[in-house]
């Protein structure tokens, strides 16, 4: 391959006198190189050879600059350059190197790319490719563009992206910091050619979305080695700042050199050898430590510590850094890049980012996502630092609430993926999360800058709205805490952690400012939705009752304003409201009270200015009670007296009816407690009526009880829809019996009476003991008839009204996934809460947060000043603002303070205050001061570990104080808790439906602090509250039997069992219960009741769906079934059942079970299969397991058994016909040969051959398709292949051929059936109906003779 590549490279052309000359076969040579690269193996020999010759710089770039280059040559040259310049990781198919050889290959590919990059620092090259792009996009109309040229342009744009994606050469020699690197020189050539303007033009075209993502990558890669600060600052300011920075660096270098020189001690001859240190013991306690090297400072001598083996973290778990590769470019490069960034913002930034957004995130382009967030961060930072406010409108696509939301979503997703995935993929998501976090940080800073410094009010309002959004919504407030708790140093870099700390610092400063200015008092928070209990529907009190308290002055004013309108209504100039009913039929009050309530209703209508309704109600009342409305009565019948009626209405308006209003409210409150109107006349029967009714019903009752007349058995004494206790159910059953007796429905009454006795056969015998006589039953029924059950009737009415609500759910019913889907209540809701800044800061005092802050603080000397300030500010908030310094009593933090103190030891006070570490030094001083003021032996031990809330509390108040305070908190009922208890009690009392939950359960589960049921009950009794029937111990277990009708379930279960237990028991019970109760009962509830009744439920197996057949095959099956059914007595005539009949004639072979199932679906009767004999299975195993050893051991002992078996086998044989005699003889000869083979010596190969022979015999005997030629040929091939011995193979082939020939020439079924001698043995076998003459399984040493006249049948 190397020779071919070298030959092709030398055949391209040569560079002479500043001009590149192409060889005649240059085009074909490039094609050959492309083919070599395409056929290159995993060692990438061709690519590496091209890189060694630096083909891009020596040949391809000069070739492209040639003016006489044809289109085809240009196209193929660009193709080869794109292929050679693709990233090394793409060449290795995106997989990182796995071993040393692959790493060596990878670095060689990278080095070749770096050498090739310098070739693109020629502006003429970019000018040449710019002409091609301009010719396509600018000079050619959209409709006239050629698809082939478009492909060339795509390759050019991709080539530019590959060129700028080549990693910089770190070993490149640079004399000064601002000397142009290879990357900078390529940028200069790129910008001088003007191709950047062409790319901006393409990015601004909405039709060219395919190029936008690649152009975005190009701009991001150009700017990746620059910082926004360098480009945003003007050149004069940069020069001054750079001069100062350079002087400062030189000063530091000199100081460090001086310090190092002064720390070196001069060598003295007396310290040239080994010596001991006084006061410092060695390994042995009796000897001093011996030193063999010079010591700079004896106090810092840690000789023993250096010898300890340090614990090393695995390589894949170590914290890592991501190099940004940024450098300070020359003023020329910075100026050109600054102008380019401004042009991007002004011409195409919004369009480019909007069109790229969908492509980048929808199509999941990993590298482009990083470049997308980098460009957002760079541009936003550039606009903020350059203070060019006129550019804010040009970046509107990447700012605002929507930008925050999109960034938040992507950042959360990246962090989740980074912490859940593993390996390179996890680090890839971590890298994307780093750039997304940087963009989020710049969004916060830019909006804050606009809010503080923008000149236009609209821009300030826009920024304020976005900032208020991110501080109000919980997702943004919890984002820093969420990320830092998820942080893992193995997949997220230290760069990410530093960016996160800075972002948190800026966000908290923003929140703190909003709190101090009063702009942030309420925030939104997601809370779990507790399913609200339904409030009672209070008696619908007249809304006009609010006018009952009107003063006399107001009434006089009202009448003066409205009497004219009332008079017009009375004169019928204005229509009154017709059909008014002054009587409330639901109120059980006397007529006098109804008249008063009607007048009150008229008064309220007048006072609420409902004059048409008031006049209509007045006329309706006067028609009902003329004696109570006497004024104007004489005129009413002939001509109405409007003036008299007006006076009476005025009196009603001004009358004092407060007492009547109280009576009305009392009557309405008792309305729901009244008896059921349907049974009202029966419930209020007096003693005389009851005596008369009993005398008339005694004879009929006696006849029913004596079984002379039938009783009703279809009635149930209990309404199972009511959620009540068993005792109350018994009362309701007695009321049902009483109402049936009083309604003269005697059969139903007796049926209810007997059913109730079966349901409650307890010791109390409320409905009589089992086996009592007729006279005793009559006496008990008379007692039930005459009993006073008015209170029971009211309770029943209340319970029935409570059960009428269709939305009410059963609290005892567990969740059933098979029920119909109900409307789901959202599990979370957003509500406003008071925002406490200290509570928010307290969330950062978590150990998982603090350990990473201390981790970054260890590198305080390398950190930027801004990062150190952010770290110290957070620790200061926790230690001093929250007054939790104990949280920071940690040895790892104290070691940082020790290093800082060492740094400040040799500095004067003036230098200390000007130092960038002064804030850290001051914070450490005050924190250690607090620590040593409380220092004890226990505190020294506690400083070794991170501390949670419990540990901090116990350090402050003593060990064990945490538990004691919690216990004291549990025992004490605070005033707020008592108020909450009262409110919950009142809430329970006003509930319309209590879902079977008593007051103690309700309060126990809704109280803000945990209190036991017993303590809640004691507190309610202490307050003098009624427990409303609740017991101190929950009695849900005792109510288990009252959930469903046990008697009916047992009866239905017995019926289902007697019917053969067909179908699903739960489905049967569910249908019965739905019909009986009129409500849906869940499967889980029925299963629970069955378990309680000790009824074993087995879920029926689901019937498998029918196998999928073709429509034509199913139609053929139907015709065969009809054909079989048309034959009279088909089973005896044909000798086969319908299954075998169909299988023989079906055009396509199908399994027997599938044919049976399809026939069953068509209504055919399928004969049952008999179980196979266990003895046959045993013989099968014996046949496989016996070997020559067994036969030898059995010699002499089993001769009688062998003789009997031979007799049996002879009786089983079928005598062959004369025409089959020859085949029969051949079969017997083959059998004898096999028997001779079996008599070979007992060797290992003989045993294996015998075992294989027996397996082959079994396979040939159990074949279901013995009449198929193909299968026979297949079996002929299988048998000899299974044997190793050549003689055995030959014998087996002879035997198999004779056996199959005998089977195939045996004929088919005849009309007279099959003649077969029955077996005389007692072995079990399958029934004759199951034996198929067509595909019958033939056992060894058996033949079946069949006639050939199959068609005649």
From Swiss-Prot:
Which InterPro entries is this protein grouped with?
Answer: Timeless, Timeless_N
Null mutant phenotype reads: RNAi-mediated knockdown is embryonic lethal. In germline cells, aberrant segregation of chromosomes is observed during both mitosis and meiosis, resulting in aneuploidy. There is a weaker mitosis phenotype in somatic tissues. Weak seam cell differentiation capacity during the L4 larval development stage, including 30% increased seam cell fusion and reduced cell cycle exit. RNAi-mediated knockdown increases the survival rate and partially restores alae formation of let-7 n2853 mutants at 20 dgrees Celsius.
Region Disordered: list its residue ranges.
798-825, 1150-1291, 1306-1335
Any idea where this protein resides? Nucleus
Record keywords: Cell cycle, Cell division, Developmental protein, Meiosis, Mitosis, Nucleus
What is one GO cellular-component annotation here?
Answer: nucleus
Q: Does the keyword Cell cycle apply?
A: yes
Here the disulfide bonds are none
**Could you give a GO molecular-function term held by this entry?**
DNA binding
* Role of this protein: Plays an important role in chromosome cohesion during both mitosis and meiosis. In prophase of meiosis, it is involved in the formation of the synaptonemal complex (SC) and specifically, in the diplotene and diakinesis phases of prophase, it stabilizes the association of homologous chromosomes during synapsis and sister chromatid cohesion. It regulates cohesin subunits to promote meiotic chromosome cohesion and localizes non-SMC (structural maintenance of chromosome) cohesin subunits to chromatin prior to or during pre-meiotic S phase.
- The molecule here is called Protein timeless homolog
Q: Give the source lineage, highest ranks first.
A: Eukaryota, Metazoa, Ecdysozoa, Nematoda, Chromadorea
């Amino acid at each position: 391959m190397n020779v071919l590549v070298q030959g092709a490279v030398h055949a391209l052309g040569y560079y002479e006198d500043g001009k590149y000359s192409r060889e005649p076969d240059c085009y074909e040579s490039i094609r050959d190189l492309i083919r070599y690269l395409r056929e290159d193996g995993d060692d990438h020999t061709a690519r590496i050879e091209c890189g060694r010759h630096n083909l891009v710089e020596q040949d391809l770039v000069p070739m492209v600059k040639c003016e006489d280059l044809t289109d085809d040559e240009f196209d193929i040259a660009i193709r080869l350059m794109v292929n050679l310049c693709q990233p090394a990781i793409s060449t290795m198919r995106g997989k990182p190197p796995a071993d040393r050889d692959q790493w060596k290959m990878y670095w060689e590919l990278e080095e070749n790319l770096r050498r090739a990059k310098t070739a693109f620092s020629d502006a003429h090259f970019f000018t040449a490719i710019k002409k091609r792009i301009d010719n396509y996009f600018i000079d050619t109309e959209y409709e006239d563009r050629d698809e082939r040229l478009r492909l060339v342009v795509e390759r050019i744009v991709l080539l530019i992206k590959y060129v700028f994606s080549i990693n910089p050469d770190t070993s490149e020699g640079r004399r000064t910091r601002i000397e142009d690197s290879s990357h900078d020189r390529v940028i200069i050539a790129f910008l001088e050619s003007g191709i950047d303007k062409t790319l901006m033009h393409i990015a601004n075209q909405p039709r060219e979305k395919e190029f936008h993502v690649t152009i975005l990558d190009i701009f991001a890669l150009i700017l990746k080695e620059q910082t926004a600060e360098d480009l945003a600052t003007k050149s004069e300011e940069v020069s001054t700042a750079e001069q100062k920075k350079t002087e400062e660096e030189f000063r530091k270098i000199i100081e460090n050199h001086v310090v190092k020189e002064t720390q070196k001690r001069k060598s003295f001859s007396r310290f040239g050898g080994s010596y001991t240190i006084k006061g410092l013991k060695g390994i042995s306690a009796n000897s001093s430590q011996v030193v063999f090297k010079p010591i700079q400072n004896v106090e810092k001598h840690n000789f023993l510590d250096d010898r300890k083996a340090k614990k090393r973290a695995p390589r894949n778990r170590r914290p890592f850094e991501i190099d940004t590769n940024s450098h300070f470019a020359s003023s020329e490069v910075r100026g050109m890049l600054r102008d380019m960034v401004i042009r991007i913002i002004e011409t195409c930034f919004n369009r480019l980012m909007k069109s790229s957004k969908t492509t980048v995130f929808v199509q999941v382009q990993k590298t482009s996502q990083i470049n997308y967030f980098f460009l957002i961060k760079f541009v936003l930072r550039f606009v903020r630092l350059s203070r060019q406010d006129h550019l804010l409108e040009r970046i509107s696509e990447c700012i605002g609430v929507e930008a925050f939301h999109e960034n938040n979503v992507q950042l959360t997703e990246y962090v989740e993926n980074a912490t859940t995935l593993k390996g390179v993929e996890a680090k890839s998501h971590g890298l994307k999360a780093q750039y997304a976090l940087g963009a989020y940080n710049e969004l916060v800073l830019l909006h804050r800058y606009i809010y503080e410094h923008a000149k236009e009010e609209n821009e300030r309002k826009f920024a304020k709205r976005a900032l208020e959004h991110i501080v109000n919504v919980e997702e943004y407030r919890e984002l820093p805490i969420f990320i830092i708790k998820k942080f893992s140093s193995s997949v997220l870099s230290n760069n990410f952690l530093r960016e996160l700390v800075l972002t948190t610092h800026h966000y908290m400063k923003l929140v703190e400012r909003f709190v101090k200015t009063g702009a942030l008092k309420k925030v939104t928070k997601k809370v779990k939705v507790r399913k609200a209990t339904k409030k009672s529907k209070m008696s619908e009190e007249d809304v006009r009752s609010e006018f009952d308290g009107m003063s006399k002055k107001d009434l006089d004013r009202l009448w003066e304003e409205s009497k004219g309108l009332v008079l017009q209504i009375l004169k019928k100039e204005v229509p009154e409201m017709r059909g008014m009913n002054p009587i409330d039929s639901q109120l059980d009050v006397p007529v006098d009270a109804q008249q008063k309530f009607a007048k009150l209703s008229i008064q309220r209508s007048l006072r609420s200015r409902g004059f048409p309704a008031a006049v209509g109600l007045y006329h309706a009342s006067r028609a009902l009670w003329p004696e109570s409305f006497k004024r104007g009565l004489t005129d009413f019948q002939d001509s109405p007296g409007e003036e008299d009626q007006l006076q009476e209405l005025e009196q009603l308006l001004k009358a004092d009816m407060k007492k009547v209003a109280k009576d009305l409210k009392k009557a309405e409150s008792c309305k729901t407690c009244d008896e059921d109107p349907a049974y009202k006349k029966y419930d209020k029967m007096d003693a005389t009526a009851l005596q008369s009714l009993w005398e008339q019903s005694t004879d009929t009752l006696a006849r029913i009880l004596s079984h002379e007349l039938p009783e009703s058995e279809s009635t149930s004494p209990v309404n199972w829809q009511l959620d009540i206790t068993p005792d109350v159910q018994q009362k309701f059953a007695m009321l049902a019996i009483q109402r049936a007796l009083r309604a003269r429905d005697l059969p139903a009454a007796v049926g209810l009476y007997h059913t109730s006795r079966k349901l409650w056969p307890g010791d109390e015998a409320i409905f009589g003991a089992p086996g009592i006589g007729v006279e005793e039953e009559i006496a008990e029924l008379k007692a039930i008839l005459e009993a006073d059950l008015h209170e029971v009737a009211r309770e029943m009415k209340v319970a029935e009204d409570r059960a009428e609500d269709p939305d009410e759910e059963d609290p005892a019913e567990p969740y059933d996934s098979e029920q119909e889907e109900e409307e789901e209540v959202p599990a979370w809701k957003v509500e406003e809460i008071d925002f406490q800044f200290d509570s928010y800061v307290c969330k950062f005092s978590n150990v998982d947060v603090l350990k990473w802050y201390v981790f970054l603080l260890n590198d305080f000397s390398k950190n930027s000043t801004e990062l150190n300030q952010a770290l110290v500010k957070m620790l200061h908030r926790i230690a001093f603002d929250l007054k939790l310094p104990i949280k920071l009593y940690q040895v790892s933090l104290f070691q940082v303070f020790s290093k800082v103190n060492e740094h400040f030891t040799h500095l004067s006070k003036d230098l200390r205050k000007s130092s960038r570490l002064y804030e850290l030094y001051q914070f450490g001083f005050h924190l250690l001061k607090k620590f040593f003021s409380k220092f004890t032996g226990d505190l020294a031990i506690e400083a070794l570990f991170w501390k949670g809330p419990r540990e901090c509390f116990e350090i402050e108040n003593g060990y064990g104080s945490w538990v004691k305070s919690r216990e004291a908190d549990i025992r004490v009922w605070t005033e707020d808790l008592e108020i909450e208890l009262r409110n919950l009690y009142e809430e329970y009392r006003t509930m319309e439906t209590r879902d079977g939950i008593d007051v103690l359960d309700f309060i126990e589960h809704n109280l803000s602090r945990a209190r036991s049921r017993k303590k809640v009950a004691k507190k309610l009794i202490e307050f003098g509250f009624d427990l409303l029937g609740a017991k101190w111990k929950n009695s849900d277990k005792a109510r288990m039997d009252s959930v469903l009708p046990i008697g009916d379930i047992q009866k239905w279960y017995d019926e289902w069992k007697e019917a053969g237990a067909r179908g699903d028991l739960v489905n049967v019970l569910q249908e019965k219960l739905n019909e009986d109760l009129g409500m849906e009962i869940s499967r889980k509830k029925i299963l629970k009741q069955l378990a309680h009744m000790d009824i074993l439920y087995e879920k029926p197996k689901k019937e498998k769906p029918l196998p999928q057949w073709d429509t034509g095959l199913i139609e053929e099956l139907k015709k065969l079934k009809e054909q079989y059914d048309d034959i009279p007595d088909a089973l005896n005539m044909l000798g086969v059942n319908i299954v075998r009949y169909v299988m023989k004639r079906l055009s396509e072979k199908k399994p027997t079970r599938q044919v049976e199932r399809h026939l069953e679906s068509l209504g055919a009767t399928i004969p049952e299969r008999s179980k196979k004999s266990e003895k046959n299975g045993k013989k099968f195993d014996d046949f496989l397991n016996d070997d020559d050893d067994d036969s030898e051991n059995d010699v002499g002992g089993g001769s009688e058994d062998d003789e009997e078996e031979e007799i049996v086998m002879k009786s089983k044989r079928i005598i062959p016909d004369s025409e089959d005699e020859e085949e029969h003889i051949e079969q017997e000869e083959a059998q004898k040969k096999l028997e001779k083979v079996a008599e070979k010596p007992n060797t290992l190969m003989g045993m294996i051959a015998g075992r294989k022979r027996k397996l082959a015999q079994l396979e040939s005997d159990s074949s279901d398709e013995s009449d198929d030629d193909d299968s026979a040929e297949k079996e002929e091939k299988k048998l000899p292949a299974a044997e190793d011995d050549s003689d055995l193979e030959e014998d087996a082939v002879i035997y198999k051929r004779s056996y199959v020939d005998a089977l195939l020439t045996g004929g088919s079924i005849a009309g007279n059936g099959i003649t077969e001698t029955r077996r005389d043995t007692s072995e079990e076998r399958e029934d004759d109906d199951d034996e198929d003459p067509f595909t019958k399984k033939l056992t060894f040493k058996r033949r079946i003779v069949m006639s050939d006249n199959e068609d005649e049948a």
